[in-house]
Design a protein with these regions (language model features):
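Charged, alpha-helix-enriched surfaces in structured cytosolic catalytic cores
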Residues: 122-126, 156, 160-161
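Amphipathic alpha-helical segments
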Residues: 21-138, 142-150, 174-176
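Positively charged n-region of N-terminal signal peptides that target proteins for export
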Residues: 1-4
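C-terminal motif of bacterial Sec signal peptides marking the signal peptidase cleavage site
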Residues: 13-16
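A structural signal for short loop-to-beta-strand junctions that line the ligand-binding cleft
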Residues: 151-155
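Sec-dependent N-terminal signal peptides
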Residues: 6-9
Length: 176
């Protein structure tokens, strides 16, 4: 009887040791976000739009600065001829205009940063949705992002789906 129980226990031990433990492997990938923004047609168009807008606004401001420099040069020529009271008044006016030009430049930069930031934030939000939908469709458990600063220090190139996402976002942008 003891031998039967011992043999039965030994058989159960063998059977339990023979079972393989199920391990679920996760399907993962990563996207180089810097590359995504560099190669995205929409991101390039946004960048170009704000370069052009900056150039137009800068040209307007530059014309004002040129006028101010011309007045400042005339001021220096005429200061001795027109007297000290005139020079003080005109100097104060020129200083005030210089400060106004400085404020205008700061305001222009702030406006451009705010507008471009809003558009880029909207772009990033839409890209996150596209990536999420792509991940669900392809059965990914995790999709990581890397770029500057790098959050992934190493991954096999086979896990890089940046090209796939760039193609999707560019195709979607072309269709709109």
């Amino acid at each position: 009887m003891k031998k039967t129980i011992l043999l039965f226990a030994f058989a159960i031990t063998l059977i339990s040791c023979d079972k393989t433990t199920e391990t679920k492997e996760f399907k993962t990938a990563y996207i180089d976000t810097s590359k995504l923004l560099d190669e995205s047609t929409e991101a390039k168009d946004i960048e170009e739009k704000f370069k052009d807008k900056s150039k137009v606004m800068g040209n307007q401001l530059e014309a004002e600065v040129t006028r101010w420099k011309s007045e400042a040069a005339n001021f220096q020529k005429n200061a001795q001829a027109n007297g000290q009271a005139w020079a003080q008044q005109k100097g104060a006016e020129l200083q005030k205009r210089e400060q106004e030009l400085s404020y205008a430049q700061e305001g222009m930069l702030r406006q451009l940063q705010q507008e471009s930031g809003t558009e880029l934030d909207s772009l990033v939000t839409s890209y996150k949705k596209i990536i999420k939908d792509f991940g669900k469709e392809k059965g990914y458990d995790y999709i990581y992002g890397t770029g500057e600063p790098a959050s992934i220090l190493y991954a096999k190139d086979s896990y890089d789906i940046t090209k796939d996402i760039v193609k999707i976002v560019n195709d979607k942008y072309k269709s709109t």
